[in-house]
A protein has these predicted regions:
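HIT superfamily nucleotide-processing domains
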Residues: 1-105
Length: 105
């Protein structure tokens, strides 16, 4: 796995603690509960491998990563019964592939 010691998602520890709490791991990703919970259940699904873009993954990795994202969305639906889950993949400040999953209010 590619690793960047300066990346919050790779290094975890104090870098990650600033904004989130790691709550689980899936085959291709880490699941992080976002500390700012203006939308209850807001989580981040971050790729275990340090890549900037989904196109940097192999086809098999891409399929598994999206399976992980879908699995987390299913759990959010079970827990919160939202009308919709919003998926955000900005990549503007964190150059590590991750999705924000935010339920509607």
């Amino acid at each position: 796995m590619v690793y960047d010691e300066n990346c919050s998602y790779c290094a975890e520890g104090a870098l990650l603690d600033a904004f989130g709490i790691k709550i689980g791991e899936l085959p291709m990703s880490k699941v992080i509960l976002f500390k700012e919970q203006s939308h209850r259940g807001r989580v981040i699904v971050a790729c275990k491998r340090h890549v900037d873009d989904i196109t940097d993954l192999t086809k098999e990795e891409r399929i598994q990563f999206m399976e992980d994202v879908s699995h987390v969305a299913e759990i959010l639906h079970e827990l919160f019964h939202p009308d919709k889950i919003n998926f955000g993949a900005y990549g503007d400040t964190m150059h590590h592939l991750h999705f924000h999953l935010v339920r509607d209010v």
